[in-house]
Amino acid sequence: MYKQMSIRVNHFESLRQRFPVFEDLRAHLESEGGVSWIPSDDTKGVLAMSRGKSLNNEMFRSVVWNTETNLPLCVAPFKAKEGLPPLGTQMSATENFVDGFIINAWVGSDEVLHVATRKKIGGTNKFYSEKTFGDLFAECLASTQLKTLDGLKDVLNALRIEQSATSAFVSFVAQHPEHRIVARTTSPGLNVVHVGTVTDTGYMTISERSTNWPQAFARLQIPSYPTRIFHSDQEVHDLLRRTSVEKGWRWQGLVFKDGHGSRWRLRTPTYTMMRELRGAEALPMDRFFRLRANHQVMDYLKHYWEDRDAFWGYEHALRNKAADVFSAYIDVHKAHAVAFKDLPDALKPAVFMLHVHWRDQLRTKGFKVRLQNVNQVMNSMRNFEKQRLMEAAPYTQVSKREVGDLPSPIAEIPETV
């Protein structure tokens, strides 16, 4: 193990020598800014450390630290750079870009398996799925020859003992049908990104090459390509284009590793477009609000048709509320039959913004407020305001004035599903 192409990291060892007590180390890192600390729910004396933008050290992207021994336990893959790799430089690997979620696992001297995402030790957080990342990971693990968390623990503990290390860790990229990002996944799966160990001084060794891993991990290596040195940008783009044609639009791109922890990620144009449509929202309602405001709902549903029923439900609710906002606006600002303060709270932001829009944009042109103006205003509202509006009780118009200005809600709203 670790005979060649390993990353030897003494940065944590040096930090520990400078700051033998964890609280001093913590104060130092916080003085540099950009570090967030995430306590473990079930493991005493363990914190996850996440690097912010102001801390200029890629190794601190996500580190799990034992506060009692003042030692690192596990380090996630360093943050990848976007774009082309250095030219004329021998890469350690040219691999497929595998889209999924990163989850890390380690075994320390307690011989207990622990897992962590970047945000939560134990993997108890969620995103797209109602299941936790820890639960999704267990299902992905079951699809491999490791089978169970106990099987993973045995492999890591054997590695720890073999290397006389205080901890042994592995980073996976997991793919699960319930956590779709771009490509649709039909069954759970795992790939190993790197494997590492930590000594009792904090010295760390990380290997990105499957030839250095325990056999159970080597079976989970990410598919790679023989070309590992590029002499021109065109060579890189040619490989990307050829492979994209061969593998189809669901193929996502390439990752280039230099063997020292740095990675470069080059995505296909199709992947980039679909990733932008998918966005960073965990909840489908928040995603719908963004897409609707940008008139991209139909583009999105061409690829993510599984959200069709939910999106249509949101659209129908918003259309109904557009009619309610229009009616409330007439009652307050046209018929003066209702005081603004007496409107339901959920309607007030939209009615207020609609009046401002009329005052600043429409009045000087002699235009009346129409339902398309309501739609425009609603799209510009904050997401929590839209959600509160959608959940509000129906509004009954008090006055009968200017009812003729209210066309069919369905016909007037341009963003259809």
PLM feature spans:
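Core nucleotide-handling region used for phosphoryl-transfer chemistry
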Residues: Y2-V417
